[in-house]
């Protein structure tokens, strides 16, 4: 199984040179694939520089603003248009997964209807550009969200589009907090377009590097593969000091977990 890693392991990009430096570290650590995280913008101006590093882009993480579920149509449309611009900005990497958070986490069902309207607009753009909208499974955070949309709800939402351009991103670090991950894989059978792989201790979305928590990641990967996933082990973890040696160790540990998958 190929290993990919998200640039979300690095801090927000405050300088245009940072992303290139981050990617050079990732390449030096032995990774060949990345997901470009939502902390990075103005990608279209740096396509050639990114290509010169010799790293391939597996996925793009979108950054759909919260107003995408607003009842104020002007605000909602502004949020959607902002995301459409990001899709255009990263279009050189299509076809690939384009990750979007599932925002229907409030009790009032009207928010869900607004979210669907926004996704319908993004779906049209995804078909135009060749992206696969990959709707991410949500974390269980009752301290933050009014309700928990489980993997069945999210996979049913995805299936309702009946489109190859809408799929699920199974975030095992999110779903592990409330659901059995083998059941999550089964719920998402046939519509898994991307995965986010990190570890936790079962209480919070710690985003630990694979192997540093309590999740049976190899077993989950096997289940995801059996349920139709064909992409890389896409690591999306956090680290306070992601030096090249640290990144290399994350790669080595993840390769051991994925051996012969």
Where are these regions (language model features)?
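Histidine-acidic metal/acid-base catalytic patches
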Residues: 1-27, 89-96, 118-121, 129, ...
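Active-site-proximal loop/turn and secondary-structure-junction residues that shape catalytic pockets
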Residues: 9-11, 38-42, 63-66, 102-106, ...
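Conserved glycine-rich "GG(E/T)P / GGGxP" loop and the immediately following alpha-helix
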Residues: 11-17, 69-77, 143-148
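Structural motif corresponding to the early beta-alpha repeats
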Residues: 32, 37-114, 230-232, 237-240
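A structural signal for short, well-ordered beta-strand segments and their strand-loop junctions
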Residues: 35, 99, 133-135, 169
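A short acidic, helix-capping loop that chelates divalent metal ions and anchors anionic groups
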Residues: 66-72, 106-110, 141-145, 203-208, ...
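Conserved anion-binding
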Residues: 101, 118-120, 132-141, 153
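Active-site cleft segment of glycoside hydrolase catalytic domains centered on the general acid/base Glu
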Residues: 108-122, 126, 145
């Amino acid at each position: 199984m190929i290993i990919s890693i998200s640039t979300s392991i690095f801090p927000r990009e405050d300088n245009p040179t940072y992303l290139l430096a981050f990617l050079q570290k990732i390449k030096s650590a032995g990774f060949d694939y990345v997901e470009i995280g939502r902390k990075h913008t103005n990608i279209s101006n740096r396509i050639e520089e990114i290509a010169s590093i010799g790293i391939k882009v597996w996925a793009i993480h979108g950054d759909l603003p919260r107003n995408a579920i607003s009842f104020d149509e002007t605000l909602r449309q502004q949020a959607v248009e902002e995301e459409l611009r990001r899709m255009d900005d990263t279009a050189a990497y299509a076809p690939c997964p384009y990750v979007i958070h599932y925002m229907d986490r409030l009790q009032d069902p009207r928010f869900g209807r607004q979210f669907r309207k926004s996704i319908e607009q993004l779906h049209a753009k995804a078909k135009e550009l060749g992206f696969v909208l990959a709707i991410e499974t949500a974390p269980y955070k009752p301290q933050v969200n009014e309700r928990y949309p489980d993997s069945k709800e999210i996979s049913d939402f995805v299936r309702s589009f009946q489109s190859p351009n809408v799929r699920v991103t199974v975030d095992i670090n999110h779903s592990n907090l409330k659901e059995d991950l083998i059941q999550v894989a089964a719920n998402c059978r046939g519509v898994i377009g991307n995965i986010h792989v990190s570890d936790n201790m079962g209480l919070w979305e710690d985003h630990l590097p694979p192997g540093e928590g309590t999740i049976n990641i190899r077993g989950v990967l096997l289940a995801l593969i059996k349920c139709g996933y064909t992409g890389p082990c896409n690591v999306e973890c956090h680290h306070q000091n992601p030096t090249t040696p640290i990144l290399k160790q994350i790669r080595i540990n993840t390769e051991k977990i994925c051996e012969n998958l």
